[in-house]
UniProtKB/Swiss-Prot annotation:
One of its GO terms (molecular function) is magnesium ion binding. One of its GO terms (cellular component) is cytoplasm. Keywords: Cytoplasm, DNA damage, DNA recombination, DNA repair, DNA-binding, Endonuclease, Hydrolase, Magnesium, Metal-binding, Nuclease. Transmembrane segments: none annotated. The lineage of its organism: Bacteria, Pseudomonadati, Pseudomonadota, Alphaproteobacteria, Maricaulales. It comes from Maricaulis maris (strain MCS10) (Caulobacter maris). This is Crossover junction endodeoxyribonuclease RuvC.
Length: 166
């Protein structure tokens, strides 16, 4: 029987942070859980970041992932928005790192290409493919993106391990 690995995928954001946990057994993928963390919008930035950090820590304790993956920051037209997204990414990355988990980072285009086959896929296409790759999974756009990040990591960790075995 193949070794089972749990991966926590994170789609960072200050308003909505998508998350998803998948199980990988050989080439089989299955969804464990997914959802969205919504920090209080009226709270100061520091409190919203603490909410994200604590929520991801709770997810790590509840679902026991072996590894985590998060979407890389992209260059936004608004520098202030990009900086705040960077803060959210850091808060989300610290919780699994503190628990001793490796945290991988993937560009959005690579995630889309891994799941849909094209880096230019839209959110609806990503969500549709997540539903196909993880049958029975009905996720919101943010949670589907997080599951896609976890799937991307599963594909890349498998390719890396196959490459090292050659």
């Amino acid at each position: 029987m193949a070794l089972s690995v749990r991966i926590l995928g994170i789609d960072p954001g200050l308003r909505r942070m998508g998350w998803g946990v998948i199980r990988v057994e050989g080439s089989r993928l299955s969804a464990i859980a997914h959802g969205v963390v919504t920090p209080p919008t009226a709270a100061p930035l520091s409190e919203r970041l603490m909410h994200l950090f604590n929520s991801v820590g709770d997810l790590v304790r509840q679902h026991g992932p072996d590894e985590a993956a998060i979407e890389e920051a992209f260059m936004a037209a608004n520098a202030a928005s990009a900086l705040k997204l960077g803060h959210a990414r850091a808060a989300a990355m610290l919780a699994p790192a503190r628990a001793g988990l490796p945290v991988a980072e993937y560009a959005a285009r690579l995630v889309k290409k891994s799941v849909v086959g094209t880096g230019a896929a839209d959110k609806a296409q990503v969500a549709a493919m997540v539903g196909i790759l993880l049958p029975g999974t009905k996720a919101t756009a943010d949670a589907a993106d997080a599951l896609a990040i976890a799937i991307c990591h599963a594909h890349h960790r498998r390719a890396t391990s196959l490459g090292s075995a050659a």
